[in-house]
């Protein structure tokens, strides 16, 4: 700790903070800014008048850095030093240094808009430009004006454009803290490899066999790539002749790992042993692993993108930016001179890579953020004129307003509703919050809590969800898991949790059915916390258990599907008349298909349900709806009329929308463009016929 570069600047930092409300600190990776800034300010009395909050874009970083600071101060984690992430709070009234995700701090501001528990807020890793951090920048800018006498803000980053942020905060000072970096030799490949996984494997084994000691850090795009490469590395290392090279330990590192597996990478290896660390971009800046001498950079990152005109998400493997490439290379020079093997030519780096990463606010859905800003209900905050460091497009803001209008969170004039305020109390995406509120009204809250918790899981719980269709069919034949009774994936998720609940949460049941034990335990904990939140607004007394370990009935399924329809009013699709393709309703209409992993059933004629809701629209080989559930025409008709009456001009002052409908007719549109309300009795008869058919198929 004594050698960390930032400690040499302690006096200068304290002096600058004392004289200024806002300070930008640019510290190279490994300079110690994440762990030491809070301790520096603590030593100089800033915790006497409040708590020091340090935000992180990633949960993993918030937990690991808090743990490290607690160790350095020799205090129990959760007391003087603690952390808060979604669904987990390890702080007490004694906590003086608090690490938390940027999203948690935003939620705290709903109940305490002045954030007056905090004397200092440090926005760390601001260069990642997460959506929540960008909103916090605008929020703390406002607070600095109001709380200038007792409030300090530090924005810290490894690569941020300091002058741009300084200008945003009216010319605040920028301090540069150099890191302790050794020279790093950059080695480029002659061309892009056909497979960056196989190329990474070859380079890693060559280093292991030929190069002197030093750990190897390999950057992959995501968990799937990491698991494939870890498996291949283990296989290759075992095949090496005994005594031909040193021993090896191979560690994966990504956000979905349990904490006890994440912290392993910080333990030094045994003597004469090399560590292979296969990581996502979390190891670029958020976490520093000592001992790395060799870096293998695939040149790719997996990035979630959102198209506001179609409402479609895509998880794309894209090229990294120059800033990211430089950060990755720098990880090799932390302890001694190192090498970075770039699996791409110099020309690609020079000509193809963007200079910096596109901010998340310009490539994601803003519905949750707009609801948050509206729920603050502050007269000086206008969502369309909010002070962003980089403003989102007007199309993205209008899309967010439309989404919120369809689920009743705002009215036709763009004002937040009573339902919208209740939704903002829940730490969930808007569609899930709205589903819970509707379930509370229709009498299926217990079931909805289960489904929402299952959808909030950090990883894919069901192995079949990510399998190709042929493998999935084989898995389905072998599986004893419930099948959703023909209604689709949400009902299956409910049935799975209820089956596990009836075993008293036996981990053996999870393993026997191919379920992730850790993921299911997470779901149980999330459900319990959501249940506690919903107690405040529930009509009836809630029980955390799944209805006394009883299975839900078909009437429960019907109520749940209706609640899902209301909560996902902007995520409804209508089947085409002559085939099982669907078209989306609430966005610019487009043809989509049910994802092959879905358990949604066709009827006796091979036709899928007329209407479905989906949790997510993704683009892979083609547009797919994922997590799909059948809903009834009677529930869809009023939503469709609301869509057709939408006037974006009233919501935001923007241009009126236009919805393009494919020429091929759908079930609802074939008879009448202006659809009357559908009788519940008629719908019930259709439902009864469908249930008789499903019973014949043995799906009850």
UniProtKB/Swiss-Prot annotation:
SMART domains: AAA, DEXDc, HA2, HELICc. Residues 200-377 form the Helicase C-terminal domain. The keyword Transit peptide does not apply. GO terms for biological process: mRNA processing; RNA splicing. One of its GO terms (cellular component) is spliceosomal complex. Keywords: Acetylation, ATP-binding, Helicase, Hydrolase, mRNA processing, mRNA splicing, Nucleotide-binding, Spliceosome. It comes from the Eukaryota. ATP binds at residues 27-34. Its EC number is 3.6.4.13. Residues 463-486, 654-682 are annotated as: Disordered. GO terms for molecular function: ATP binding; ATP hydrolysis activity; RNA helicase activity. It catalyses: ATP + H2O = ADP + phosphate + H(+). It holds the Pfam family HA2_C. InterPro entries: AAA+_ATPase, AAA_22, DEAD-box_helicase_OB_fold, DNA/RNA_helicase_DEAH_CS, HA2_WH, Helicase-assoc_dom, Helicase_ATP-bd, Helicase_C-like. Residues 14-178 form the Helicase ATP-binding domain. The modification N-acetylalanine is found at residue 2. A motif (DEAH box) lies at residues 124-127. Belongs to the DEAD box helicase family. DEAH subfamily. PRP22 sub-subfamily. May be involved in pre-mRNA splicing. This is Probable pre-mRNA-splicing factor ATP-dependent RNA helicase DEAH4.
